[in-house]
UniProtKB/Swiss-Prot annotation:
Originating species: Cercocebus atys (Sooty mangabey)
Post-translational modification N6-acetyllysine, affected residues: 59, 82, 144
Name under which the protein is recorded: Hemoglobin subunit beta
N-acetylvaline: modified positions: 1
Entry binding sites for heme b: 63, 92
GO molecular function: haptoglobin binding; heme binding; hemoglobin alpha binding; metal ion binding; organic acid binding; oxygen binding; oxygen carrier activity; peroxidase activity
Assembly: Heterotetramer of two alpha chains and two beta chains.
Keywords: Acetylation, Heme, Iron, Metal-binding, Oxygen transport, Phosphoprotein, S-nitrosylation, Transport
Length: 146
């Protein structure tokens, strides 16, 4: 991902304020509610029958935290996202058979959740930087599919 020095500062400064537990669960939950076909990858998570069940599901929250933990790792290795996400790309491609388009959807949902949590602090410039990052992460996660 090619970020300007200002964009890197914007991304890392905001990320330092992110509650990974809360934002991760909300982002994954929203993905499952807004794009219900993604629920098929989470059938073992129990009740996903309605938005309240999804958003309150402890397994969704726990996995969302795990997802954002990996995203945090990516933010520490912006110059090597493909290497950072190589194993996760392989897992999602070969074993889980996740449609790589879902990585883009989750990235965009994450941007929405960050905007919701940070309001005016999530300026258009910050959003532009985050859109670059989530696109780069989605691309890295889709790498093994090519």
């Amino acid at each position: 991902v090619h970020l300007t020095p200002e964009e890197k500062v914007a991304v890392t400064t905001l990320w330092g304020k992110v509650n990974v537990d809360e934002v991760g669960g909300e982002a994954l939950g929203r993905l499952l509610v807004v794009y219900p076909w993604t629920q098929r990858f989470f059938e073992s998570f129990g009740d996903l029958s309605n938005p309240d069940a999804v958003m309150g599901n402890p397994k969704v929250k726990a996995h969302g935290k795990k997802v954002l933990g990996a995203f945090s790792d990516g933010l520490n290795h912006l110059d090597n996202l493909k290497g950072t996400f190589a194993q996760l790309s392989e897992l999602h491609c070969d074993k889980l058979h996740v449609d790589p388009e879902n990585f883009k959807l989750l990235g965009n949902v994450l941007v929405c959740v960050l905007a919701h949590h940070f309001g005016k602090e999530f300026t258009p410039q910050v959003q532009a930087a985050y859109q670059k990052v989530v696109a780069g992460v989605a691309n890295a996660l889709a790498h093994k599919y090519h």
